[in-house]
C-alpha cells in the first residue's frame, strides 16, 4: 500500500477515562513529547468526554481542557494538536478557546444516529480553518446504510473526514468492513474516513487493519491501549503489525514501545486490559467509558460490575446516560431483594 496512514493518537483524551481524567501537566507533557518525537500525525487532548466534559456526570478533571492543551502546545513541534467536542457538552465558544490554546484539529462527536446536532459546530470549526472531523460514536448501534446517511450529513456541514467509532468495542471485522464499504459508496471521494476502535473483544488492531483495507485514511490508537474499557487499539501493536505488512505509517516503533511501557503503563491505577468487566462491555455493546462508573456503583451497592454492564447493554444506553448507571444498580438491588 503506497499511501501514508494518518496516525491519530488518543492517549491524552480517550486515555483520560482510564485514570478518571487525572493526568497531571507533567504527565501530558511527557506523553506528548514522546509521541511527537515518534512522529505521530496528531495528538488529541481533552477531558475524556471532550471539551467541558469535566462535570459531576462524567467526572471532574485534574486540570481544565485549556491547561492540558496549552501544556501540550508548549512541547509539540511536529504533530497537530487535536481535541474532541460533543455538541451539548462543549460549545463553539469552548472550541474557539481550544483553538486559541493551540488545537488545530477538532473531532465533533455525536451518537451514530444524531449527526444533525453537529451542524453548528462543524460549520464553526471550518470557519476557524480547523481540520474538521465528524465522529459517529457507538457505530454498532445502527446499520451500515444508516451510518452512511449520517456520515453524509456531517460531510454536507463541512467535515472533511468522518469516523466509524466503535465506542463499545463490540464490532468484528465483518461489521467494520460493511460500514466502510457503505461510507465509501456514499461520501465524496475527496472526503476522508477514519477508524476509532476499542479493544474489548481484542479486535482493536484487527478492526483497524480491515478499515484501512477498505480505504480508511486515519486510524486512532493509544499508547499501551490507554483508553476507556479495555482501551483503544494499542498504538505500538498496530504500528508493529502494519509495519510487518509493509504499510507506510511514518512513525518510530521503538520510541512508541518505550513510551507505552516507561511512561503510560505506570500511570494505570486499574490495568487497561481485556478482563471480566471490559469483556462484558464488548459482549453487551456498552459505551466503554461506563466501566469505571459501573465499578464504583457496584462497590457502593454490593453488586457485580458485570451485571450492571450487561443490564446497561440490554437497555441500549448510550454515551451521556452515565446517570442511569446508578438507576440500573438500584433496580438490580431491588430485584436481588425480591429474589
Curated annotation (Swiss-Prot):
Binding site for Mn(2+): 14, 196, 198
One record GO biological process: L-leucine biosynthetic process
Lineage: Bacteria, Pseudomonadati, Pseudomonadota, Betaproteobacteria, Burkholderiales
GO MF annotations, alphabetized: 2-isopropylmalate synthase activity; 4-hydroxy-2-oxovalerate aldolase activity; manganese ion binding
The entry's keywords: Aromatic hydrocarbons catabolism, Lyase, Manganese, Metal-binding
Family according to the record: Belongs to the 4-hydroxy-2-oxovalerate aldolase family.
HAMAP family referenced in this protein's UniProt entry, alphabetically: HOA
Gene3D superfamilies found in the cross-reference section: 1.10.8.60, Aldolase class I (3.20.20.70)
Domain Pyruvate carboxyltransferase: 5-257
UniProt xrefs under InterPro entries: 2-IPM_HCS-like, 4OH_2_O-val_aldolase, Aldolase_TIM, DmpG_comm, DRE_TIM_HOA, PYR_CT
Residues of the site described as Transition state stabilizer: 13
Lineage top rank: taxon: Bacteria
A Pfam family reported for this protein in Swiss-Prot or TrEMBL: DmpG_comm
Protein name: 4-hydroxy-2-oxovalerate aldolase 2
Organism the protein comes from: Paraburkholderia phymatum (strain DSM 17167 / CIP 108236 / LMG 21445 / STM815) (Burkholderia phymatum)
UniProt keyword Metal-binding present: yes
Active site: 17
Residue sites binding substrate per the record: 13-14, 167, 196, 287
UniProt catalytic activity: (S)-4-hydroxy-2-oxopentanoate = acetaldehyde + pyruvate
Listed EC numbers: 4.1.3.39
Amino acid at each position: 500500500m503506497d499511501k501514508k496512514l494518518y496516525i491519530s493518537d488518543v492517549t491524552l483524551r480517550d486515555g483520560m477515562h482510564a485514570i478518571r481524567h487525572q493526568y497531571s501537566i507533567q504527565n501530558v507533557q511527557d506523553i506528548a513529547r514522546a509521541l511527537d518525537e515518534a512522529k505521530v500525525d496528531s495528538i488529541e487532548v481533552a477531558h475524556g468526554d471532550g471539551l467541558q466534559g469535566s462535570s459531576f456526570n462524567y467526572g471532574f478533571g485534574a486540570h481544565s481542557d485549556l491547561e492540558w492543551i496549552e501544556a501540550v502546545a508548549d512541547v509539540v513541534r511536529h504533530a497537530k494538536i487535536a481535541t474532541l467536542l460533543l455538541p451539548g457538552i462543549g460549545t463553539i465558544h469552548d472550541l474557539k478557546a481550544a483553538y486559541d490554546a493551540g488545537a488545530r484539529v477538532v473531532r465533533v462527536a455525536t451518537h451514530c444516529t444524531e449527526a444533525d446536532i453537529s451542524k453548528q459546530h462543524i460549520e464553526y470549526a471550518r470557519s476557524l480553518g480547523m481540520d474538521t472531523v465528524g465522529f459517529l460514536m457507538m457505530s454498532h448501534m445502527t446499520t451500515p446504510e444508516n451510518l452512511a446517511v449520517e456520515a453524509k450529513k456531517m460531510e454536507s456541514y463541512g467535515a472533511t473526514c468522518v469516523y466509524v467509532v466503535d465506542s463499545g468495542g463490540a464490532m468484528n471485522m465483518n461489521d467494520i468492513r460493511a460500514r466502510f464499504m457503505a461510507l465509501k459508496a456514499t461520501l465524496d471521494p475527496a472526503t476522508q474516513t477514519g477508524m476509532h476502535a476499542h479493544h474489548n473483544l481484542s479486535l482493536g488492531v484487527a478492526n483497524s487493519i480491515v478499515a484501512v483495507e477498505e480505504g480508511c485514511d486515519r486510524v486512532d490508537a493509544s499508547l499501551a491501549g490507554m483508553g476507556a474499557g479495555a482501551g483503544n487499539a494499542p498504538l505500538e501493536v498496530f504500528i508493529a503489525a502494519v509495519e510487518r505488512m509493509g504499510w507506510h505509517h511514518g512513525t518510530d516503533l521503538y520510541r512508541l514501545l518505550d513510551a507505552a511501557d516507561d511512561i503510560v503503563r505506570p500511570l494505570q491505577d486499574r490495568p487497561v486490559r481485556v478482563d471480566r468487566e471490559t469483556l462484558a462491555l464488548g459482549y453487551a455493546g456498552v459505551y466503554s467509558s461506563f466501566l469505571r462508573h459501573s465499578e464504583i456503583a457496584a462497590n457502593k451497592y454490593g453488586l457485580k460490575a458485570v451485571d450492571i454492564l450487561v443490564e446497561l447493554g440490554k437497555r441500549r444506553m448510550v454515551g451521556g446516560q452515565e446517570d442511569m448507571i446508578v438507576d440500573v444498580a438500584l433496580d438490580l438491588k431491588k430485584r436481588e431483594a425480591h429474589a
